[in-house]
Design a protein with these regions (language model features):
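Transmembrane beta-strands of outer-membrane beta-barrel pores
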Residues: 12-16, 91-97, 133-135, 148-154, ...
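Short helix/loop capping segments that flank catalytic or ligand/cofactor-binding pockets
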Residues: 19-20, 182, 266-268, 275-277
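Conserved small-residue
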Residues: 23-29, 117-120, 136-244, 277
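Repeated loop/turn-to-beta-strand initiation elements of outer-membrane beta-barrel proteins
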Residues: 83-87, 139-140, 262-267
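Conserved C-terminal beta-signal and adjacent last beta-strands/turns
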Residues: 143, 245-273
């Protein structure tokens, strides 16, 4: 038989989640606060001695609760050629509701950081593929297994008081893919000071000085003659653009194994085919 096994799968599930960016006891139970006390830690002296100090705890958010994670998964398994060739494929969509995201910005008169809160939804979609071959030739057994996967996470909803276009490109906003990289576009390095001077007449950065040979020639994208970040908002980000994403894409793995008369050997490789890096 050419095809020995073919199985379709589908599943749905919903779980409470406490495994997020905030994993400590104090993050998940902010209503249990302690007033920190330190001995002889002050920066001032009274009668020639440092004084004991006490500090107030953070603001309490009594409404914070578990995140809700809902997952859909569809896939199939197959086996062929007497199950020497096997494989699986899965596509999934995981939605995290009431996720603990960055706290909303409050007025500086508050005097401290705003408490963490369940304020956004995020969806992670991806797929996983694995194909393997296992066979035997007389006393020699061998196997090969290859896997490939990919996923991306996107912010679905995030609260913002005001116009959507006024949100900062550095924070969460509706439709943002996690780990976006914003940066300036360049056309290369200046080969001479003359080339750089000519370039600066219509593409002058609003930072730095003494530009010359070997420096990066940044491109003015909005046509105002100045290379800048504008207001760093979705509506006015100057000459910044999405130049990449730091999320690892297309993770791969390769496993090889063999056995012959009591001796065995195995080796594996793993890596990432695409990832943007910034510094």
């Amino acid at each position: 038989e050419t095809v020995n096994t073919l199985k379709l799968r589908g599943s749905w599930g919903q779980l409470g989640n406490t495994s997020s960016n905030y994993n400590s006891f104090w993050d998940w139970y902010p209503f249990y606060q302690q007033q920190a006390i330190s001995s002889a830690s002050s920066n001032w002296l009274i009668n020639g001695e440092k004084q004991n100090t006490s500090s107030l705890p953070s603001i309490v958010n009594a409404t914070m609760t578990w995140e809700t994670v809902e997952t859909w998964d569809f896939g199939f398994d197959f086996g062929a050629f007497n199950n020497r060739l096997t494989g699986t494929f899965d596509w999934y969509s995981r939605t995290t509701k009431d996720m603990i995201g960055p706290a909303p910005i409050l007025g500086s008169v508050l005097g401290t950081n705003a408490p963490k809160t369940n304020n956004c939804d995020m969806r992670t979609s991806g797929w996983e593929l694995e194909i393997g071959w296992r066979d035997q030739i007389n006393d020699f057994k061998y196997g090969v297994r290859f896997n490939l996967s990919d996923n991306r996470s996107k912010i679905l909803t995030y609260p913002y008081d005001g116009e959507f276009s006024n949100q900062s490109i550095g924070g969460y906003y509706n439709g943002k893919y996690l780990n976006e990289i914003w940066g300036y576009e360049s056309v290369g390095l200046a080969s001479s000071k003359v080339e750089m001077d000519n370039w600066l007449t219509t593409n002058k950065p609003n930072w730095g000085s003494n530009w010359g040979a070997g420096d990066v020639m940044y491109k003015d994208l909005n046509g105002d003659g100045i290379v800048s970040s504008g207001a760093n908002t979705l509506d006015d980000h100057g000459d910044l653009k999405r130049i990449g994403n730091a999320t690892p894409r297309y993770r791969i793995g390769l496993n090889l194994d063999a056995a012959y008369k009591g001796f065995d050997f195995s080796i594996f490789f793993q890596g990432v085919l695409k990832r943007d890096w910034f510094f």
